[in-house]
């Protein structure tokens, strides 16, 4: 007798990508319940950072402190399970992706299209981040200031 079961279809997403999409769906459900409060977003970011590997956690903590001090108008929230900082419209401006999220050898500081980083016809929107230093902090401050300008 012929096999009538349908073989599993590959959707092209890795397990990590599917997990991130599930995290985002949960975030959207939580935001829809009585509206997300700034305190809820902050706690979600802190919880996200706490779950990271020690090296990533140290970077994420520095990014968090630097972004919130540089642009206090940005609201902390999680975005696909990652620490992110959104404008008053709730649109993510800047986010931190830890190296463990998708198995990369570096963490990423990324900016969405709401960030004002335009510089000619081409400009970077993501930065590999391996270690924190005074020079890195200065560059992050400059990028965040430009992003919210």
Regions found by a protein language model. Name each.
Residues 1-149:
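Charge-dense, helix-prone N-terminal extensions
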């Amino acid at each position: 007798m012929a096999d009538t079961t349908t073989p599993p279809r590959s959707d092209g997403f890795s397990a990590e990508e599917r997990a991130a999409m599930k995290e985002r769906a949960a975030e959207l459900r939580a935001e829809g319940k009585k509206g997300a409060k700034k305190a809820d977003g902050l706690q979600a970011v802190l919880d996200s950072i706490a779950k990271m590997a020690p090296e990533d956690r140290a970077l994420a903590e520095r990014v968090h402190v630097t972004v919130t001090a540089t642009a206090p108008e940005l609201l902390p929230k999680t975005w696909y399970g990652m620490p992110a900082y959104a404008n008053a419209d709730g649109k993510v401006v800047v986010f931190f992706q830890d190296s463990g999220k998708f198995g990369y050898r570096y963490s990423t500081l990324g900016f969405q299209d709401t960030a004002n980083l335009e510089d000619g016809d081409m400009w970077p929107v993501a930065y590999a981040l391996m270690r924190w230093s005074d020079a890195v902090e200065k560059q992050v401050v400059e990028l965040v200031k430009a992003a919210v300008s």
